[in-house]
Amino acid sequence: MSRQAVGRASAHEACDLVDWPRDATRRLYSDPFVCSHRLHEFEMFSDASLATLIDRFPHERLEVATMVSGRAGWSDWHIVDYRGVSGTDLIAAIRRGSLWARLMRVDLVSQEIADLMRTVYAHILHLTPDLEIIWSQPSILISSARAQVYYHADAFPTMLWHIRGRKRVWTYPLNDETLVSQQALEEIIAGSFCQMAPYREEFDRRAGVFELPEGHLLCWPPHAPHRVENLSDLNVSLTFWYESTISLRRREIYMANRALRKYLRIRRPSTREDGAFPDLKRRAYRLARRLGMLKTGKLDPPTVAHYRIDPSSENGVAPLPGGVQLPFLGNRAIRAESAPYFN
């Protein structure tokens, strides 16, 4: 298939782009799994193409962070001011330092990438029609050879399409209170700041460990804790947040439980997802939300950078005394604008 014609390809013509298992719908919600893909063969993910994309990417959708001190933990995660730096220089700084960049909602900026992902997911949905995706948000991740993303859990299901470089991912069991409590998971799913159990090396004994060379896709159960370390070279991945009918049912149960805990002081509401009572609980939650009876929580705090990009420095960044507020919309605002991706 012509790489230029990917936007016009049918699900059958796209079958060589990803080795998607037919039992994936069941596995997505129970166990991590890896399959191969061919996205790394596309020129749109080269340094030159990514630099051009960065040059025209809206500032409010581009986030850059550094792990400048090398300490393992979120206290070492610092936002970086990238404004006024060309895409070429930003990529050069990422190569030199310990940097992580995320281009959120890349589908709104690059029609080429949007067409590619639409083609790939047409094939995925052809193979697994019971995977009913409601909306999605693809983002490009570009990170340094020694960058890492610390122990955390996500509010939405995620697929990680690894395209360039090598990385190692640890995924941890979901229903383990020593890793993440039920209450913490409720706050994560609600989009509120939440302190998970601090990472300890002993957690790794319960983890699944996956080394990803280019051309591999990793999926793990929604909301399962995980962490990532890059192993070599500049890393490029496409991360795909999405909501399905199954994940929405689970999220609504946890959101309802959060409301029960907060307003009715129920200390440990049930996380059961199937049956008459869970269905009633979900309906009651949706009604209460529609009537404005539930507080939606605070918006993301302003994004303040205390470092700026400096491609000539050893770490790719330089201190920014006093800090500066950036125009980044924030995760919550970007999630709220999600629209159906598959028609």
Regions found by a protein language model. Give the residues of each.
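A short hydrophobic beta-strand segment most commonly corresponding to one strand
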Residues: Q182, S232-L248
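Conserved short histidine dyad/triad with adjacent acidic residue
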Residues: S139-A153, Y172-D176
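Double-stranded beta-helix
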Residues: H162-C219, A224-P225
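Catalytic micro-motifs at enzyme active sites that drive phosphoryl/nucleotidyl and oxygen chemistry
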Residues: P21-D23, T88-I91, H126-D130, A145-H152
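Active-site-adjacent segment of 2-oxoglutarate/Fe(II) JmjC oxygenases
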Residues: E201-D204, L248-L291
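A gly/proline- and charged-residue-enriched helix-loop-helix capping module
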Residues: L103-I140
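Transition-metal
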Residues: S2-R118, N257-L264, A288-N343
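A short beta-loop-beta micro-motif enriched in histidine and acidic residues
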Residues: W135, Q148-T158, R205-R206
